[in-house]
Amino acid sequence: MTKFSTLHRAIPALFVLLAVYYALPLLLKIDWWGVRDWDLFTTIAAVPAGTVLHYGQFPFWNPYLGGGNILFHHPEVTVLSPFFLLYLIFGSVVGLKLQVLVCYGLGFGGSYLLARAFGVSRVAGVLFSVAYFGSVHFALHIAEGHMPFTHYCFLPWFSYFVIESHNRRHWIIWAALALMLMVLGNGGAVPLVYTLLFTGLLCVLLGLRDGRTAYLVNFVAATIAGLGLAAVKFLPGVIYLAENRWEGNPDESIPFSALGKIFFGFEHSLFVKHFDEQTWAWHEYGAYTSPLLVLLAMTALVWRFRQQWPWLVMAAFFLLLGLGDFGAISPWAILTSLPGFASMRGTGRAFHFVILAVAMLGAIGYDLLCARLSVSRSMISRVVVNLAAVGIIGTNLIFAWNILSEANRQPPEPVHRAEQFRQAIDTQGRAFRSYLANRGALRSAWLSAYHPSRGLVTDNGEVLQEFVLEGEARVNAREITPNVMTYDITGSTAGRMVTGMGFDKGWAAADGRPLEAVNGLICFAFDRGNQKVILRYRTPHLWLGLAVSLASLAALGGMWYHVRRPTRSS
């Protein structure tokens, strides 16, 4: 086990260069719009920034997707995160690409520390970092526009501090901060669930190997502390998801025959299809692992099996998990019956951790071979081993450049921004254009935790902004901003009006009149005569979450003070 201070000065510089290399295909077209899910995630980065900059409001609600949906407490939306500053300063298109750059740097650095925690050399630590965080798997997801996957950069940091905290108990604080940053950013859904599954299982296996419960105890403590710090977002989000469950794919599976293409094939692109049962595009499957890395991993298992068997179990478990539902006892079938994991889809995302486990074993195997060869003094053999390491790294670099170069194919378009917001129907995949035009996209891509699209659409495709359900009334004026809707109404009679905005229990009328959901849309009663109706949105349970976050911060601050305070000499 090593200390943070053991990092050589050249290592951070190397990781900065690697991060620039991986992000460069995006940075070379820094203002271009991305393909596929870039449209969706560029939009949900732009909306909170625009809510602050255009309206001076806190980003509680997103009126721009699917007829209106949650924003602040959505698990894949960044607000209370340092990355939000990038969106505010540079805009969402450029800000997300800078986020990729930063996250690659953090991911390489954290991966290096995690490897060093298991006793590998500096060179082997670099090998692990590039074999794992520089893998095809991450390049495919980032090229696809899956911004939540950038927040896997905090996984190795969380795991590292949890593992090291059995010697330095206060490092639980650093683990908690890593988890907090993941949740407050884009990583509160898939990355969070898999990070806790991976780290928890690793701690159990290490505890069994070493006969210690400290790993698991520290993992639980760090998880509670991290989620406590992030409770201002996490708690409202969990309550929302419990009340509005979104379905996963419990029956999804990958045929065993596809594993060769997935792990050892040389054709990895966003636009390829390799097997008939391929449900998703290739970004959900590609997990290239160099055969040379596998050979090094096998070396570690042959020579140090009693010490390294936990990594073999990890690789086997996540391989089986990635295969999906192949029977009642399959890990996927079991886990998707549990809360939290029940909403998962894309079984191939579990292959991420097969790469991690094999890369760790490969780094250990590299060191073992180098140690043996240093004794034998075989120069040729040492050259061959180092060339193998260079080949592993070089292959990932080449694959990643080609894949990430596929991300940007659309130069920016000039879009006129309308003064008044309206819901509208446009071609799917144009949500960001709709946002720039100040139009809500009723036809938008599916997003985790969002309600299905809802709106007032007539049989001939006309989109209404409101509809008088009962009685008679005239809307003299309306002003719709993200968190506030204001209607100037003249009612000929009393009645009820349905708005074109999706209902959520966070909406409330300023004058206390009751609101109800009609076909998923906000409905309110109006009276006879002139009246102004103001509807405001606030994230439900926000203050409860904030109280838990502040209490967690105070508790961890007390722990830090207790550990760091100087002791009196006797």
Residue ranges and their predicted role:
Residues 461-570:
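Active-site-proximal, structured, solvent-exposed surfaces of multi-pass membrane proteins
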Residues 2, 204, 289-320, 557-560:
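Hydrophobic, aromatic-rich transmembrane alpha-helices
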Residues 220-227, 360, 366-401:
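Signature aromatic-anchored transmembrane alpha helix within multi-pass, membrane-resident enzymes
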Residues 107-114, 154-166, 200-205, 294-301, ...:
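Transmembrane alpha-helical segments
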Residues 1-25, 218, 383-390, 554-570:
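Start-transfer (signal-anchor) and selected internal transmembrane alpha helices
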Residues 18-108, 130-152, 254-279, 324-332, ...:
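Membrane-interface coil-to-helix junctions
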